[in-house]
Each structure stands twice: as structure tokens, then as C-alpha cells.
Amino acid sequence: MPKVGMPEIRKPQLVKATMSVIDRVGLHAASISLISKEAGVSTGIINHYFGGKHGLLEETMREILRQLSSTITGKLRALPADAHHQRINAIIDGNFVGYQAENKVAKTWLAFWSYSMHDEQLKRLQRVNERRLLSHLRRELKALLSAEQAELVAHGIASLIDGIWLRGTLNPQGIEADKARIIINDYLDKQLTFYSHKI
């Protein structure tokens, strides 16, 4: 968490620089020196306000998560409360559009996932994000399925989102958002059909 007093105009500048450097050289080689040069600030500013590279990565991920949450919330607000299938699609879509689909954002996500396995603070951020996604999905799926079925399908969709993201970061062409939506919707439709026959 950045210290109080960090000029608000500098945060986006540093977050953008962090992602650009990670995109170019990878997380391990993304030094404070390279990031500060990319952002046009002194290394002292980063160390003072963020306590170093770890703090800056944490703030970068917080910003990515804020953008993701804002995108999904905005899409859901634009839809009727009872348009459950559309709302599920909006949740899925929010993970693959605009800011989230940028290659440098995808690579930062991958670095974050890798780091979060061994870092409690980053692991906590990952859990918050996972819980939020599952909560959104469960809420809509429970209107279409039993609670147990909704839980299984929510985890299935979340796993597909994560898997497609991972494959996208390793693909030189990046994430293919249209294909991702087709794959996940195919899974969702098959699950809804399968469970409707079990009633």
C-alpha cells in the first residue's frame, strides 16, 4: 500500500511503467532502476512511497483489480437484475475486454500469480479477486441451478477464465477474447442443458 502523500498523478504513471517494464524484461529483471527510468522519476520516490519493488507490484495489482471490478460492476449495472444468462456473460466478458486484454496487463497478472504463491500479502489479493469472481457467478447461477450445481459451474467458469488467461500470456498473439467467450459460453450452455435434464 503506498504511503499517504503520494501524488495521485504519479500512481498511474508508476503503475503503467511497472507493467511496461514487466512486459519488456519480465518480473525478475524489472528493477526499481528500470521502472523509475520508464516512469521518469527517481528511484528514491518509489522506495519512499512504496518501500521498493514489492510494494509497487502490490499497488500495480490493486489497480488492475480495481479496473477489473469497475468494468464488471459497470456491465452488471447496465443489465436487468433478472437477465441472469446475460449477466453471466457480462462477468465473463469483463475479464477479456479493454484494459484486461492488454498484453502488458496479462503479463503482469502472470507475474502476480507466480509471486502470490510465496507471498502472503499478494496471496490475500489473489483470494479477494477469486472470491469476488465466484460470488458474482454464484449469484447469477443460483437463479438457474441448485446451489450445489451453481457452485460447481461457477468454479468451472473461473477455471476456464484463468486457464485461457494463462495460455494467452504464453501466446505471442496474446489473449483471443472472442475465442475465450465462445469456449466459456459453450461450457456454460452445456452445463445448463445437462442440469436441466436432471431435474
UniProtKB/Swiss-Prot annotation:
Database matches in Gene3D superfamilies: Tetracycline Repressor, domain 2
Q: S-adenosyl-L-methionine: present as a keyword of the record?
A: no
BP terms from Gene Ontology: glycine betaine biosynthetic process from choline; negative regulation of DNA-templated transcription
Q: Which HAMAP family match?
A: HTH_type_BetI
NCBIfam families cross-referenced by the UniProt entry: betaine_BetI, PRK00767.1
Q: Which UniProt keywords apply?
A: DNA-binding, Repressor, Transcription, Transcription regulation
Its function? Repressor involved in the biosynthesis of the osmoprotectant glycine betaine. It represses transcription of the choline transporter BetT and the genes of BetAB involved in the synthesis of glycine betaine.
Its protein name is: HTH-type transcriptional regulator BetI
Residue ranges for the DNA-binding region feature of this UniProt entry: 31-50
Q: Where is the HTH tetR-type domain?
A: 8-68
- One MF term in GO for this entry? DNA-binding transcription factor activity
Q: Pfam families of this UniProt entry?
A: TetR_C_6, TetR_N
Q: InterPro entries under this entry?
A: BetI_C, DNA-bd_HTH_TetR-type_CS, Homeodomain-like_sf, HTH-type_TetR-like_transc_reg, HTH_TetR, Tet_transcr_reg_TetR-rel_C_sf, Tscrpt_rep_BetI
Pathway recorded for this protein:
Amine and polyamine biosynthesis; betaine biosynthesis via choline pathway [regulation]
